[in-house]
Regions:
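Adenosyl-5′-phosphate
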Residues: 1-20, 146, 306, 312, ...
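Low-complexity, flexible helical/coil segments
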Residues: 110, 119-122, 137-140, 244-245, ...
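Alpha-helix boundary/capping detector
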Residues: 109, 121-125, 130-141, 218, ...
Length: 575
């Protein structure tokens, strides 16, 4: 659907305030109903029965925020307008107020078209910082005059058109009793199987990506356990020594399934492409960070589908089941009696001096305070300390080829970072939730950019029930001396071989990245030094040429180039 849907709420109070008018710009056809004195407007294909039977309560709204339905949901009563986008949909809520009308959408570009499309240089500059904390980047809009709400935030607009955001932290009920662990594993297993079954309930054909890793393999074994026929796809590794290939072959042979192979990820990568149009002309809402696998995705999308198809991926598995950077911080709080021994072991294992490791483990800095300190360190030193146990693991630093003006612009934010609340008080759970939201956004981008392929990309590890079940498990379930992802192993025990979890090595793809940059080196320098970002004053061409003149490019610079290429390409496609 194009155009806008218009709604209003006229108060019956004696003061007769003006009608509050809102418009949902773009998106799907919508339906409006009433529950008591409340107007409820939702996407037509996602009828919300929870709000039909009775006037919506705050609890009902909070429950809906944590689902994965797409689209803007609006509710209006005498107190004003409430709008939100379910967090796990992978979409975000954007809004603007124009001529006393509240414009809402999951597309910032649609609103920008209504209020005047001007790129926001501050947001673009911040987007160039690949290590920028997600708590900041999720609240940025690439268009001037358009505001963004982070996932798990509800927008409230009153009759005076004053807008404010209400955070709604996701509910995670941790299992504290050891006797309840087996029950928790059973619940995780049930949630995983139900998530897969829900996704294959239609008559659509099913394909499953097998990369050689644990998560994609788990998808395949769950599909087999549900007696659903499916095909297997994978991209060959560039090197014959890459063990992912060997493990993928073992899994496919064990399942006795037809395999569809594609060229290696590196040979079809768009990681260092700053000029190509997007597939089918579908420009994403924000620059993509998966351009290294875009060629593989395009190959999958080009397959001729007579019928709809479901494509399973392993996105989200690492966040749910792996040992995340802040795990040691969480463990010393989960097992306080063992914390001295764990603290010493952590410092020894990672070769960190006790005088630095112990304060990091004991640190109780709040999330908003941490974000403020990050920005102060960036302003003063151009980088932050490399603390793996902080809310945002690792160092945050300005890219080496970023202009001085861009550095200044990136720190001028339209909100107070000190007031941002964490998604969970536990740092590991918070890190997992933030990263999972990023994976949900990738899945949404895949589906938005390739609708012509009639393929729906999905992952059971991004199902809200699976997320709640996995993150409720004790943190110590993420560690095991001999197994990868021991929590997932326990949930899959009985229909997935133990050997897959006992794998001691991971695939190596660094050489593919170096091959790709060597292939595109000269062209990329020209595209970036004389491109849109340089015209906007966000990239320093002299610094770029100096770095490119070096014979060997560092891995850090390669990551910078991937980010610069993604943003440059996006800007060229929207201008």
């Amino acid at each position: 659907m194009t155009g806008v849907q218009v709604g209003s709420f006229a108060s019956t109070g004696h003061s007769h305030p003006p009608d509050l008018i809102w418009r949902v710009v773009g998106g799907e056809p919508r339906v409006r109903t009433r529950a008591g004195t409340t107007i409820i407007e939702t996407p037509k294909n996602h009828v919300l029965t929870e709000l039909r039977s009775a006037p919506p309560s705050r609890q009902a709204v909070e429950d809906l925020v944590q689902t994965d339905r797409p689209g803007v949901i609006t509710l209006a009563d005498g107190s004003g307008l409430i709008a939100f986008v379910p967090a796990w949909s992978g979409q975000r809520l954007y809004w603007a107020i124009d001529d006393d009308i509240v414009l809402l959408s999951t597309s910032a570009r649609s609103i920008a078209g209504a209020v005047g499309p001007r790129l926001n240089r501050n947001s673009l500059a911040a987007t160039l910082i690949g290590t920028l904390p997600l708590g900041i980047s999720m609240r940025l809009s690439p268009w001037s005059g358009v505001h963004a709400a982070a996932p798990f935030e509800i927008l409230h607009v009153d009759h005076s058109l004053a807008a404010h955001l209400i955070p709604v932290a996701p509910r995670i009920d941790p299992i504290a009793d050891d006797e309840a662990i087996e029950e928790g594993i059973a619940q995780l297993r049930k949630s995983l199987m139900e998530a897969v079954h829900y996704r294959i309930r239609s008559s659509a054909a099913v394909t499953c990506d097998i990369s050689g890793g644990v998560d994609s393999a788990a998808n395949a074994y769950m599909l087999r356990a549900l007696h659903r026929g499916f095909n297997v796809t994978r991209a060959r590794a560039h090197s014959k020594w890459n063990l992912d290939d060997r493990w993928a072959e073992r899994i496919v042979n064990d399942l006795h399934l037809p395999l569809i192979e594609y060229p290696s990820i590196g040979s079809t990568s768009f990681a260092y492409d700053a000029t190509s149009p997007y597939a089918y002309g579908n420009v994403p809402e924000t620059p993509i960070n998966w351009s290294d696998t875009e060629g593989y995705v395009r190959s999958l999308a080009r397959r001729r589908n007579r019928h709809a198809r479901i494509q399973f991926t392993g996105l989200g598995g690492d966040e749910l089941f792996s040992a995340l950077p802040a795990l040691a911080w969480s463990l010393v709080r989960e097992l306080p009696l063992s914390s001295p021994r764990m603290a010493i072991r952590y410092c020894l294992n990672y070769r960190i001096p006790l005088r630095r490791g112990i304060p990091s483990l004991a640190n109780r800095t709040g999330y908003g305070e941490h974000l403020e300190q990050c920005l102060r360190d960036l302003a003063a030193h151009g980088k932050t300390p490399d603390d793996q146990l902080a809310w945002t693991a690792g160092a945050v630093s300005f890219p080496s080829c970023m202009s001085e003006e861009a550095k200044r612009l990136s720190l001028d934010l339209p909100f107070d970072p000190g007031g941002i609340q964490p998604l969970n008080r536990d740092r590991t759970v918070h890190q997992a939730l933030e990263s999972l939201l990023g994976q949900a956004n990738i899945t949404r981008q895949l589906n938005d950019m390739f609708p012509e392929s009639r393929t729906t990309w999905t992952s059971p590890f991004l199902d809200p029930r699976v997320i709640r079940a996995a993150l409720a498990m004790p943190m110590r379930m993420r560690e095991h001396p001999f197994l990868n992802k021991p929590m997932l192993y326990k949930a899959m025990r009985g229909f997935m071989p133990r050997e897959i979890f006992a794998r001691t090595t991971k695939g190596e793809y660094t050489s593919e990245s170096y091959n790709a940059i060597q292939r595109d080196r000269g062209r990329l320098l020209r595209d970036l030094a004389g491109g849109a970002l340089a015209d906007l004053g966000l990239v320093d061409p002299k610094k770029l040429k100096t770095r490119f003149s070096m014979k060997l490019l560092s891995s850090e610079f390669l990551f910078e180039l991937q980010r610069f290429s993604a943003v440059e390409r996006w800007v060229r496609n929207v201008l």
